[in-house]
């Protein structure tokens, strides 16, 4: 089974998250996408972060597609960093083929994530285009560091079964929605 892992604060979850998930399901030929609602992002301000249980409930109410599952399990395992969460999942589910999913806006700061290189060694990564990042994301520090591991967009359906490191950038229709913009309204 091929599972896309889409982590984030989901503060709040919105139609843009659904767009990214459906794009990944279709273009990567995934069976499921799991939304990993994080207890807190070490790189973001927690002052505006709604409680985890509220964000999980709101995300579940939005994600009515049966191929999308919402979980807040990171809080239960005491994980604070994506690399730790992904390592935990890979150890417990070795028969599953995971792909880490991220928006192109996150690729610009990916090199600041704790052990970002370990994430790329644990599973392939799919970067989904976002407005304003089409041209800048591929020149991000992490993208440059792993340029030789980038696969062609036409080969994206095979990403989940490729040896790591491997990543791709998926162009296409983009959603301009963002949780930050929704919170400031």
From Swiss-Prot:
The keyword Nucleotidyltransferase applies. It catalyses: nicotinate beta-D-ribonucleotide + ATP + H(+) = deamido-NAD(+) + diphosphate. GO terms for biological process: NAD biosynthetic process. The keyword Flavoprotein does not apply. Its EC number is 2.7.7.18. Pathway: Cofactor biosynthesis; NAD(+) biosynthesis; deamido-NAD(+) from nicotinate D-ribonucleotide: step 1/1. GO terms for molecular function: ATP binding; nicotinate-nucleotide adenylyltransferase activity. PANTHER family: NICOTINATE-NUCLEOTIDE ADENYLYLTRANSFERASE-RELATED (PTHR39321), PHOSPHOPANTETHEINE ADENYLYLTRANSFERASE (PTHR39321:SF3). Belongs to the NadD family. HAMAP family: NaMN_adenylyltr. Catalyzes the reversible adenylation of nicotinate mononucleotide (NaMN) to nicotinic acid adenine dinucleotide (NaAD). This is Probable nicotinate-nucleotide adenylyltransferase. The lineage of its organism: Bacteria, Pseudomonadati, Pseudomonadota, Alphaproteobacteria, Hyphomicrobiales.
